[in-house]
Amino acid sequence: MACTTILVGKKASYDGSTMVARTEDSQNGDFTPKKMIVVKPEDQPRHYRSVQSSFEMDLPDNPMTYTSVPDALGKDGIWAEAGVNEANVAMSATETITTNSRVLGADPLVASGIGEEDMVTLVLPYIRSAREGVLRLGAILEDYGTYESNGVAFSDEHDIWWLETIGGHHWIARRVPDDAYVTNPNQFGIDHFEFNNPEDYLCSADLKDFIDTYHLDLTYSHEHFNPRYAFGSQRDKDRQYNTPRVWIMQKFLNPEIVQDPRSFALAWCQKPYRKITVEDVKYVLSSHYQDTVYDPYGSEGTPVSKKVFRPIGINRTSQTAILHIRPNKPQEIAAIQWMAYGSMPFNTMVPFFTQVKTIPDYFANTYENVSTDNFYWTNRLIAALADPHYNHHETDLDNYLEETMAKGHAMLHAVEAQLLAGETVDLEEENQKMSDYVQGETQTLLNKILFDASNLMTNRFSLSD
């Protein structure tokens, strides 16, 4: 999918957590309704068949429970996208990335292989660490191949790993430095790799021979190996579609660094100028190039500059999950899955405890027809109504975001305090309370946006009886 990813190491985050976040964006002209569910062991397939390809394989008989954000309609496959399992291991898959003809000539894509549709279902229920996730997915890639190029994130309380596929059967992975964050658009990202450091770098067994055989290393002999040069792209499209997204995220998280939005040398990871919060992650994944000439809603640019770069906060985002694995917490509340549906400049992030058996209907009961009975369609309505007059509605949107996320933090603090006091807490009930609150606030926002948008219609007239 046409997504944007940010990964935050535990020493770069405000609370010592690891954070993995990604927008799932549909293709241009398409929109994909999503829902959040819990997949219990009895619901996990023992023999898996893909819809997008002819791939199939037997799965282990001991899956763990895990959260999932599948397509609501299911006609194109599962597309589970993001979740946390009962071992508090998280996975986000996938970020569609680029490749090049040299790689594809050496290791062609495999039409019968796996893709984004399949990966979470095949891996997340069976792993007990982020590293295990890399190794399981890597083994499947080597055995079955893939029909597309993808980046995949795995995280646990201690580590975040980022894996990128190379051609049909190869892969490479790097552990995110603890004191750094990673920004990754739809482009091959890893720009440094050490073959002699398996603690922080992993790859398919024959990758070094593969590189040597097909002359893929484009670095000089005295330089470190740069996988982005070997396996990635430097296309004109990347300068319009990909590198600007990295630039604007790093501009916010490292304002002291001056960079070119069209540069191919933007770093895969950076140490932020201060620690990163959940709100920061929400902000950068909602970015439309605020305070630059590239902002389509701004006043600084020209009609041309406002349309030149692809925003992160785009109209066709299906869902966004922040997988927040917190240290030094009771295990049942260590993992939080913050969820948003729809276009990011117009929504909020809602926290859910993941060690549960069900998800509230407002987030789980998405269906084909437009309705205000669920979070997905209500957010889509708000975005479509507010977009033509964004600056008029901006204060209402900001207030809604601040108030609902404050309520989310308050809920997390209250539940932790209860558990530490020895009280019993029903986490499904707490999730339901949060959902009910957000449903009320979202309906209130929709009412206000609709009223204001109606008064801004082109056919309005100031005189009345």
Curated annotation (Swiss-Prot):
Checking Gene3D superfamilies in the record gives: Penicillin V Acylase, Chain A
Corresponding gene? pepDA
Going by the UniProt record, its keywords in alphabetical order are: Dipeptidase, Hydrolase, Protease
MF terms from GO for this chain are: cysteine-type exopeptidase activity; dipeptidase activity
Reactions listed under catalytic activity: an L-aminoacyl-L-amino acid + H2O = 2 an L-alpha-amino acid
Q: Which organism is it from?
A: Streptococcus pyogenes serotype M3 (strain ATCC BAA-595 / MGAS315)
Q: What is this protein called?
A: Probable dipeptidase A
> What is one Gene Ontology biological process annotated in the Swiss-Prot or TrEMBL record?
proteolysis
| Residues of the active site | C3
Name the top EC class.
Answer: hydrolase
